[in-house]
Curated annotation (Swiss-Prot):
Transit peptide: 1-59
Primary localization class, coarse: plastid
Bias type Gly residues, positions: 70-89
Keyword Membrane in annotation: yes
Keywords of the record: Chloroplast, Developmental protein, Membrane, Plastid, Transit peptide, Transmembrane, Transmembrane helix
Protein name: Protein RETICULATA-RELATED 3, chloroplastic
The gene coding this protein: RER3
Task of the protein: May play a role in leaf development. Required for leaf mesophyll cell division in the early stages of leaf organogenesis.
Organism: Arabidopsis thaliana (Mouse-ear cress)
BP GO annotations: embryo development ending in seed dormancy; leaf development; photoperiodism; response to reactive oxygen species
Length: 337
């Protein structure tokens, strides 16, 4: 009996040893192990290098649990915002620890993702375009603007802000690229960026974008006009305090009237020019080599800003917000007396 019991124990041990156990991968000893998931409708391809055995989140910011987790808030793909900080969408913007600065950085990255040429366009707009704008402004003033340098400096400051705001607002984002449901109210079916945006939009939809952007730009121009007028008048007062014998060659622009002039200029002239410019650049980017395209951007931005600077001076003369003749006539009468 003892011999039979010993044989049964030996056979049981041999049966257990014959069972194949699953292979256990020790991630701490094999740091180069790669885990990949195939691309499908809800999960993007993921390649993870386990460089640390204490990896807390192997799929940071993933789209599980019903969250979209996409690039800048658009639906369809991407995990963790595609490098835009956070999991994308409005939730990440609202929870940004940097406040307005964080929101601006996220918006900038989203625009770069939608248009890789966006930083170059902004750079050309601020350097070449703004220089051309100042030249156009000075060329439209008497004595090439040398007697109105306070106005020219005000145009320089306000123009640099407005140029950036215009490009930032018109540029498509990764979240709204191809979306027509981002504008409010009756403009909800209109293109979200500019009237020549790619998509199946009607003529009225595109015209609606022109109207909506015009109202937005007019509001921005009104605020910038207030700032610019305050800067210009402040410089005049400062120079008078430093040099009591100084006489202003021109009548200081009225704050409200000059602000309304800026609003009209932005809502009508600047809006129409920038809408058209974005459409032209969109077409040129498809047919021209990168170097030729960048050269064309420089030329277009330069010509656009020269026209913008000249049109603003003409409009300011028409509205009387920056009048030279009235001040000259007053000075002549004072000399006669």
């Amino acid at each position: 009996m003892a011999a039979m019991a010993a044989k049964l124990q030996l056979s049981a041990k041999s049966d257990q040893s014959s069972v194949r156990l699953p292979r256990v991968i020790n991630l701490s000893r094999d740091p180069t192990t790669r885990v990949s998931f195939p691309r499908n409708g809800s999960v993007c391809s993921l390649h993870t290098n386990f460089s640390s055995p204490h990896l807390a989140k192997p799929c940071a910011g993933g789209g599980g649990g019903g969250s979209t987790g996409n690039n800048g808030g658009g639906s369809g793909s991407g995990g963790g915002g595609g490098g835009f900080g956070g999991s994308g969408g409005e939730a990440s913007e609202e929870s940004s620890p940097w406040g307005p600065i964080g929101l601006f950085i996220q918006g900038w990255r989203s625009r770069v993702a939608a248009d890789p040429q966006f930083p170059f366009k902004v750079l050309m707009e601020e350097i070449v375009g703004l220089s051309a704008c100042v030249l156009g402004d000075m060329a439209s003033r008497p004595n090439f603007g040398l007697n109105e340098l306070d106005f020219v400096f005000s145009t320089l400051v306000v123009g640099s802000i407005l140029n950036f705001v215009l490009m930032y607002m018109l540029a498509p984002t990764a979240a709204t690229l191809g979306s027509s449901q981002t504008l409010p109210g009756i403009f909800r079916n209109c293109p979200s960026s500019h009237m020549f945006e790619q998509g199946s939009f009607t003529v009225m939809n595109r015209f609606g974008t022109l109207v909506y952007k015009g109202m937005v730009f007019a509001s921005v121009g009104l605020a910038a006009g207030l700032v610019g007028t305050a800067i210009s008048n402040g410089l005049i007062m400062l120079r008078k305090k430093m040099d009591p014998s100084f006489e202003t060659p021109n009548k200081p622009p009225p704050t409200v009237l000059n602000s309304l002039t800026w609003a009209t200029h932005m809502g009508v002239s600047a809006n129409a020019r920038y809408q058209t410019l974005n459409g032209i650049e969109f077409l040129l980017a498809k047919v021209l080599p990168p170097l030729v395209f960048k050269t064309s951007v420089i030329v277009l931005r330069c010509a656009n800003n020269v026209a913008g600077g000249m049109s603003f001076v003409l409009l300011a003369r028409m509205t009387g917000s920056q009048s030279v003749e009235e001040k000259t006539e007053i000075s002549e009468k004072e000399k006669d007396d």
